[in-house]
Amino acid sequence: MIKEKIIFGIDRKEISHFTSIELQQTINIHHTFAIKVPHSVIEKPRAYTMENAQNWLGKVVHIQLENKNNFLGIITNIELDFNLDHVGSQIILTGFSKTILLESGTKMHSWEDTTLQDMVREVIKSGANEQLQNEIQPEFTHKINYQTQYEETDFQYIQRLAKQYNEWLFYDGEKLFFGKPKNIREKERIALTFGQDLYTFKLGVKAKQTQFGAFTYNEDYNKLYKVQTQNKVEGLPRLGDQTFEASEKLYNTTSLEYGRIPTGDEGFLETILKKRQEAAMADANYITATSGNNKLKIGSIITINAKEEIEVNSAHRLGLDATKTNFQTQEVGTYIITEITHKATDIGEYENSFKALPAFIKTLPEAQVAFPQAQNQQAIVIDNADPKGQGRIRVKMQWQQTKNLRTQWIR
């Protein structure tokens, strides 16, 4: 579909021509892009090496698909593609969203009595300085007694925290969100009509394991807490509720595992498991589609409509002019986009394909990231005067000794 001009620039300078752009955006992970630029845009004719293009490596790329739909990324790879066909030789630029700034190597760090918000903000500031816009507003606001970043990159650690506490995590093209955006329900809804700007459309449901059980041990009070999820998930549409019921019958036993985070009471553990259940069911009802609307991006709220021609007899009954073609519109549902791929060409062609979930789900699907596995480590005991008289100690691991860090009270 021919759309308004797509603007593409590098290091704050607009590039006059491009051959094609492909941008893949998904919640919980880095976005990726591939841009083809004619060889002649920056290199001399008959140049068989890079004389200028290599200077783009590590630079910020800006793609403006529409006035309010921008993408900022980092170029991490450049190739010269020599070709004798009608397209000619190309410079191929590939890279990631600016979240890639948080992948500068695995790290080890620890925090005591700190909120999730403060931890994530500190990690982003340390890894990306002021280069990555962010909005960090997690629902979990309690102080956390002790938390460790353990042989994880900054982004892997943020992914793991999002999974551990079932917080929203996504990059909207310009800003990284950790926690559900406060104005998500007030966002402008974008209407898409099947047969107009919505080219193909699939609606699906899938059975999911929905019943979770967990236990934790509170060593301060020598008490074991054990809970399991209930048979209700909020925020699902009719199809989601029916999918939940079918899933319960299919997977009719409850899992049991050690709680992902330490809790002080059963009510707290129940809340955490409820959010995990919401995350599991978030994509049980979904849609996939292709569209020509270049306003769409991760986090967009869309309303899907189906437009049908009204038969002549029905037009008469409705008091419509039967000599004209009349249409009626039926609303299919309201959704939030969680995956989208944009494709554009230099002649103004544009199309996207996307996946979307029911708009009012409470929690996004979990990030697919593994929890770190701890190993035996050497440590120095720095305190054995347990204020609660329970025989606990504090230690410094070797990696904590240069950072003035320490563990919590441990046995």
Question: Across the structure, where does each feature detected by a protein language model lie?
Answer:
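Amphipathic alpha-helical and helix-coil boundary elements used as assembly
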Residues: 1-411
